[in-house]
Amino acid sequence: MVKTIDTDLDFNGIIIFDYPGILAPFGGKIDDGENILEEFTTTDKGELVLNEGIALPIMGLDDGGYVVRFFLNEFPDNEDREVIFTDKYFYLNVTGDLYFADMAVFWEWEDYTGWVNADVPKGIYKVSLEGVHLLKGEETIYCYDLIFEKTNQLGTRDVEPRSDSRLY
């Protein structure tokens, strides 16, 4: 496992994105306060960032606490792990650093505010997203596992982001 992030969401979604790759659809610059989420949902820029491997959204979440785990060329241990859904494959092209953030950062852009570096090395990856319950005794932890497999080129994405990725 590359990294585990505990998060408390405020904005009904998570975004995994490449920086500086995310700047490309905006001519190389995003102004502080700009609402790029609206651009992605009302123009073809949303499809562009998915197809070019710039971003991967996890949408339709309830506010609250989640664990997000990043696996690189390895798979999660299935002991005490119940898979709720699997979406594959997305592609991510990490040209700089890969960041995790609450979707709110795309609502009101500010460089590096609320971003967490996922510590995934540069490269092209096909990514499987799994929504899972981690069972710890009587407790259920709501988790998203991103399983990265290194590849030589971007593939054709044959999955759409879910509008409802809730695990409750």
Where are these regions (language model features)?
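Extended, solvent-exposed segments with strong compositional bias
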Residues: 79-114, 118-120
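Extracellular structured ligand-interaction cores
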Residues: 115, 124, 143
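A glycine-anchored, Pro-Gly-centered beta-turn/N-cap motif
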Residues: 120-128
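Primarily secretory-pathway and cell-envelope proteins
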Residues: 1-91, 136-168
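Short beta-strand-plus-loop segments that form exposed binding edges in beta-rich domains
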Residues: 130-134
